[in-house]
């Protein structure tokens, strides 16, 4: 982790030198988010299989949670995703990952360090893509509610429902980030077909 932060600080400090290994950074970021998405799917499947009755499973499947990250403005469909700029997709991905800084602490699987590494990689890609533009200016900063309060209040007294809500939101957000990073990476290769 210290190496990642050192690399980040060195690259941010060397603004006169562009990052030339962007395709490799994209490959690493896509690989990491794919791993996180698979991990989210596994955690969700393990949770569902731990439920004792089919009625409990059906009850949970009827619940469609509102996630804290739903307040992050993102493309509504695959066409809008494909029309979005690489920088916009990276910015949305960063914000989605950032929205899990606190909630990931309550999920198993050692997610926090993995999310932190991915967030650092996405920040490097933003730096490489923006050519000095201030991506996180006050006009574009989204104010999300405090994550800890939102996710602590989910499900009230029902820990099963709370866990279900967290896992559902995490799986959904990792799928979004995987899609956005894959489309952004594809745009680097002119001969690639970037359809979803």
Swiss-Prot record:
Its main location: secreted. InterPro entries: 4_helix_cytokine-like_core, Somatotropin, Somatotropin/Prolactin, Somatotropin_CS. Zn(2+) binds at residues 35, 178. It is found in: Secreted. Disulfide bonds join 67-169, 186-194. It comes from Takifugu rubripes (Japanese pufferfish). The keyword Zinc applies. GO terms for molecular function: growth hormone activity; growth hormone receptor binding; metal ion binding. Keywords: Disulfide bond, Hormone, Metal-binding, Pyrrolidone carboxylic acid, Secreted, Signal, Zinc. GO terms for cellular component: extracellular space. This is Somatotropin. Belongs to the somatotropin/prolactin family. The modification Pyrrolidone carboxylic acid is found at residue 17.
């Amino acid at each position: 982790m210290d190496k990642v932060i050192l690399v980040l600080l060195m690259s941010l400090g060397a603004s006169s030198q562009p990052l030339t290994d962007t395709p490799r950074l994209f490959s690493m970021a896509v690989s990491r988010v794919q791993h996180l998405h698979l991990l989210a799917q596994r955690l969700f499947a393990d949770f569902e299989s731990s439920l004792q009755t089919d009625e409990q499973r059906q009850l949970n499947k009827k619940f469609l949670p509102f996630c804290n990250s739903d307040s992050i403005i993102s493309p509504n469909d695959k066409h809008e995703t494909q029309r979005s700029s690489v920088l916009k997709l990276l910015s949305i991905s960063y914000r989605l990952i950032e929205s899990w800084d606190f909630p990931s602490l309550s999920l198993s699987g050692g997610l926090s360090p993995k999310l932190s590494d991915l967030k650092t990689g996405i920040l490097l890609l933003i730096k490489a893509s923006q050519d000095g533009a201030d991506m996180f200016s006050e006009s574009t900063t989204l104010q999300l509610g405090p994550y800890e309060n939102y996710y602590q209040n989910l499900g009230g007294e029902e820990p099963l429902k709370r866990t279900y809500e967290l896992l559902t939101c995490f799986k959904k957000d990792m799928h979004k980030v995987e899609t956005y990073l894959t489309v952004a990476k594809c745009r680097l290769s002119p001969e690639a077909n970037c359809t979803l």
